[in-house]
Amino acid sequence: MSIGKLHKQAKEKVDRSQVYPIGEALALVKEVAHAKFDETVEISVRLGVDPRKADQMVRGAVVLPNGLGKDVKVLVFAKGEKAIEAKEAGADYVGGDDLVAKIQEGWFDFDTAIATPDMMGTVGKIGRLLGPRGLMPNPKVGTVTFEVGKATSEAKSGKVEYRVEKAGIVHAPVGKVSFDAEKLQENLVALFDALVKAKPATAKGTYFKKMSLSSTMGPGINVDLPTVQALVK
C-alpha cells in the first residue's frame, strides 16, 4: 500500500473535532503510526504567553524518565580535567579549537553541545552556525556548566530542551511509537510538569490553552488537558 493511502487511513481514524483523554490519545498515536521506521512521538502545547515579551519566555530542559529511545551524540567543549570528566561520562566528542574548526567546515554529527563557561569565548566563534540549529550551549538549559559529567549523563539519558515559539507553542519529543503507552505517558507528564514549573509570573489567564500529540508521519490528535493535569503531582 502506498504511503499516501496509509496516511489517509491514519487520518480517518482520528476525529479532529474530538479531544481524547491522554490514555486514549497515546494508544491512538501508536495505532495510526504507519511509517517503516520507529517514529518519534511529539507533543505540541499552546501556552497563554506572549513570547515577544522577555518576561514571558518559557524555556528550559527536563530529563525524561524513560529517555528518547535513541543514541544521543554529545559534544563537549572543555579542556584539562573537565575534558577527562566529560569523556568518562560518555561524551562522544570532546575538545576545543579542533572541534570549532570541524564545525566551521560544515560538520554537525552531534545532537547536543555542552561547554564549560571558560570555553564560551571559543564557542562564540561558531555561534551563528550553532544557534540556528538549536545547538548553541546555553546556561538556561544547563549546557553551559562546569558540571560537564552530570550534563553529559543527562543528555545521554534523554534530556529534552523546550522553548516557546512565536505563536506561544512548545514542540517537544516524548519518545518513540515503539514505547509502551505507560512509558510515553510518564515522559509526557515529566515534560508537562516542567512546563507548569516554568510558568512566567507575568502570564495572565489560562496558561495551558491546547495540546496535541502526533508521531513523525501521523496526524495530530487533540488531547483533553484536564486528563493530563490530573497526572501532575
Swiss-Prot record:
**UniProtKB keywords:** Repressor, Ribonucleoprotein, Ribosomal protein, RNA-binding, rRNA-binding, Translation regulation, tRNA-binding
A GO MF annotation of the entry reads: tRNA binding
Q: The organism sits in which domain of life?
A: Bacteria
Q: Which NCBIfam families match?
A: rplA_bact (TIGR01169)
Q: What is this protein called?
A: Large ribosomal subunit protein uL1
- Outline the subunit composition: Part of the 50S ribosomal subunit.
Q: Which family does it belong to?
A: Belongs to the universal ribosomal protein uL1 family.
Record's Gene Ontology CC terms? cytosolic large ribosomal subunit
> Do the record's keywords include Methyltransferase?
no
- Organism, scientific name: Syntrophotalea carbinolica (strain DSM 2380 / NBRC 103641 / GraBd1) (Pelobacter carbinolicus)
Kindly state a single biological-process term from the GO annotations of this entry.
translation
Q: Does the keyword tRNA-binding apply?
A: yes
Give the function comment from the record: Binds directly to 23S rRNA. The L1 stalk is quite mobile in the ribosome, and is involved in E site tRNA release.
Name the InterPro entries on file: Ribosom_uL1_bac-type (IPR005878), Ribosomal_uL1 (IPR002143), Ribosomal_uL1-like (IPR023674), Ribosomal_uL1/biogenesis (IPR028364), Ribosomal_uL1_3-a/b-sand (IPR016095), Ribosomal_uL1_CS (IPR023673)
Cross-referenced HAMAP family: Ribosomal_uL1_B (MF_01318_B)
Upper lineage is: Bacteria, Pseudomonadati, Thermodesulfobacteriota, Desulfuromonadia, Desulfuromonadales
Please give the Pfam families that the UniProt record associates with this protein.
Ribosomal_L1
